[in-house]
């Protein structure tokens, strides 16, 4: 297994790095063109990101440094269940990286988290593209960059907790393929688990999409899959 993984990385590392860093750098250049960069006077905080998300990430930073309870906080109205806040806003795998920022620099933290998530979306789609499309290897990278910089992601980039869903969506689709074609459920299970832990809001929508995608794929190749459904 280790040798297989090493061989995979040896053969594909340039494409994997490109799928991550090209959208990462393109988005960073776009931000730079409008005056957004680390420690700049402008930031990625807009709309709810300014009034809510930066404060939520700062409070999570307090949790990580032992200054606040993980289970309940009094820093919102009359208090609230902090775990419910995490389940929608702060459940992403990259969120703990705010530990390395001061609360005063939280706009910079969200700037880097946004770029990391966009780059990760590109890398995630590369895995799907490689397994799905029989096209030249650099075309997989082109598709990955296009996916990571789609208009929805760019337009809603200030809604940072939504970006995680686009990291897991390609893995969910790839997991459906593996379940249908190889009867291997592990990738789909892990992808769903991380998706719903990260953001149940998009998890619900991607769950519905998965249901429809499964049937669409089944009926477009009925002769191949009908025996498995009956079985």
What are these regions (language model features)?
Residues 23, 119-131, 137-219:
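Membrane-embedded helix bundles of polyisoprenyl
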Residues 24-125, 145-166, 205:
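Membrane-interface coil-to-helix junctions
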Residues 52, 59, 203-204, 215, ...:
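Transmembrane catalytic cores of multi-pass membrane glycosyltransferases
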Residues 15, 102-109, 113, 135-143, ...:
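Membrane-interface starts of transmembrane alpha-helices
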Residues 35-40, 103, 182, 218-226:
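Transmembrane helix-loop junctions in multipass membrane proteins, especially transporters and channels
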Residues 1-36, 230:
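Start-transfer (signal-anchor) and selected internal transmembrane alpha helices
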Residues 10, 133-138, 224-231:
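Membrane-interfacial loop-to-helix junctions in multi-pass inner-membrane proteins
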């Amino acid at each position: 297994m280790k040798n297989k993984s090493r061989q995979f990385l040896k053969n594909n590392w340039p494409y994997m790095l490109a799928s991550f860093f090209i959208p990462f750098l393109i988005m960073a250049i776009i931000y730079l063109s409008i005056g957004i960069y680390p420690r700049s006077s402008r930031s990625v905080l807009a709309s709810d990101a300014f009034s809510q998300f930066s404060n939520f990430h700062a409070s999570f930073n307090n949790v990580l440094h032992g200054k606040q309870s993980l289970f309940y906080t009094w820093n919102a109205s009359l208090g609230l269940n902090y775990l419910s806040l995490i389940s929608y806003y702060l459940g992403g795998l990259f969120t703990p990286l705010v530990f390395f920022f001061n609360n005063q620099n939280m706009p910079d933290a969200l700037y880097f988290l946004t770029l990391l998530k966009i780059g990760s979306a590109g890398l995630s789609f590369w895995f799907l593209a490689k397994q799905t499309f029989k096209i030249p290897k650099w075309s997989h990278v082109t598709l990955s960059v296009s996916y990571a910089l789609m208009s929805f992601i760019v337009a809603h980039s200030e809604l940072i907790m939504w970006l995680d869903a686009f990291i897991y969506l390609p893995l969910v689709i790839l997991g459906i393929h593996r379940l249908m074609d190889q009867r291997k459920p592990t990738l789909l299970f892990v992808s769903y688990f991380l998706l719903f832990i990260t953001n149940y809001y998009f998890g619900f929508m991607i769950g519905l999409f998965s249901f429809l995608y499964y049937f669409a794929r089944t009926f477009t190749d009925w002769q191949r899959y009908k025996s498995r459904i009956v079985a």
